[in-house]
Amino acid sequence: MSHQLPDVQASQPDVTVGLSQVGVTGVEKLVKIARDGKRPLVLMAEFEVFVDLPGGRKGIDMSRNMQVIDEVLEAAVSEPAYRVEDMCGDAAERLLAKHEYTTTAEVSMTAELVVREDTPASGLSTQSTAEIIASATATDEGTREEIGAEVVGMTVCPCSQGMSASRARDVLQDLAVDDDTIEEFLDKVPQPGHSQRGHATLTVETQGSPEVDLMDLIDIARDSMSARIYNLAKRPDEDHMTYHAHANAKFVEDCVRSMAELSLEALDHLGDDAVVHMKQSNDESIHQHNAHAEREVTLGQLRDELDA
């Protein structure tokens, strides 16, 4: 005689508190991104998938739910997709439809993207990487999608550089160099300052697909720092990076503000309700701590601030 196993997850919990996110993390899938006239871009992606849980239900049927989640992701990644954020949106909507007790489904994805480029001075072919960030949240009211990336660059501290310039000015004055020549020299030869490896993150979230080019967001994030960095660097390239970084010294706060300004120019086709999340974290070279700044803001509010 067979026995039907009890559905413990559907029972009432001892503490009837609802949960905003229950699901799985670390789900790895191969993702193919279609490209017009080119071979598909294949990414090794890692997903996080969550639904909300009402207070009257003990659990989400984790074992069965994992099968549902796997089926949803497999269906989403097996169909041609041109945008990873749309794929996340499709997965979130499928997940929401399969859970009668949930009101919100969230799917997020990260993956390494290899970018081919040339070194700035020697013109040699090289590669860099960016971490793609994509997510979607589906509710009965619709689906919001997010796309962006985290990139690495170089920053130079303006305060440290200012102290070096002051010392250089004093030495040149002691050598009887006239003030005009000193200022011209300091203007043409940026003085040393302590540098950091910077991590810039930029994402855009809208109702439905953001209709934003991922490579534009990557360029904005890289250009918001003092200088771009490259894996391959001959001596002319090292000189180029070092000079331009010191000629464009920025605090961590400056990087986020540069991201805001560049984003406003590139995203002028989006509505005021689009949300931009900008984040900068710098690995300090002369401290054991790191520097951090960020801002999450609607494009409408950002437009008001920069137009003021």
From Swiss-Prot:
Pathway: Cofactor biosynthesis; 5,6,7,8-tetrahydromethanopterin biosynthesis
Residue stretches in coiled coil: none
Record's cofactor remark: Binds 1 Fe(2+) ion per subunit.
EC numbers: 3.5.4.39
UniProt xrefs under InterPro entries: GTP_cyclohydrolase_FolE2/MptA (IPR003801), GTP_cyclohydrolase_MptA (IPR022840)
Reaction it catalyzes: GTP + H2O = 7,8-dihydroneopterin 2',3'-cyclic phosphate + formate + diphosphate + H(+)
Site positions for May be catalytically important: C157
Disruption phenotype: Cells lacking this gene are auxotrophic for thymidine (dT) and hypoxanthine. tRNAs of the mutants lack archaeosine (G(+)). A slight growth defect is seen in mutants grown at 45 degrees Celsius in Hv-YPC (yeast-peptone-casamino acids) medium supplemented with dT. Absence of pantothenate from the growth medium of the mutant cells results in a slow-growing phenotype.
Chain spans, region Disordered: 282-308
Cofactor(s) demanded: Fe(2+)
The keyword Metal-binding appears for this protein: yes
GO biological process, one term: archaeosine-tRNA biosynthetic process
Top EC class, one word: hydrolase
Molecular function in Gene Ontology: GTP cyclohydrolase I activity; GTP cyclohydrolase IV activity; iron ion binding
Record keywords: Folate biosynthesis, Hydrolase, Iron, Metal-binding
NCBIfam families documented for this protein: GTP cyclohydrolase MptA (TIGR00294)
Family of this protein: Belongs to the GTP cyclohydrolase IV family.
Binding partners and assembly: Homodimer.
Function: Converts GTP to 7,8-dihydro-D-neopterin 2',3'-cyclic phosphate, the first intermediate in the biosynthesis of coenzyme methanopterin. Involved in archaeosine (G(+)) and folate biosynthesis.
Protein known as: GTP cyclohydrolase MptA
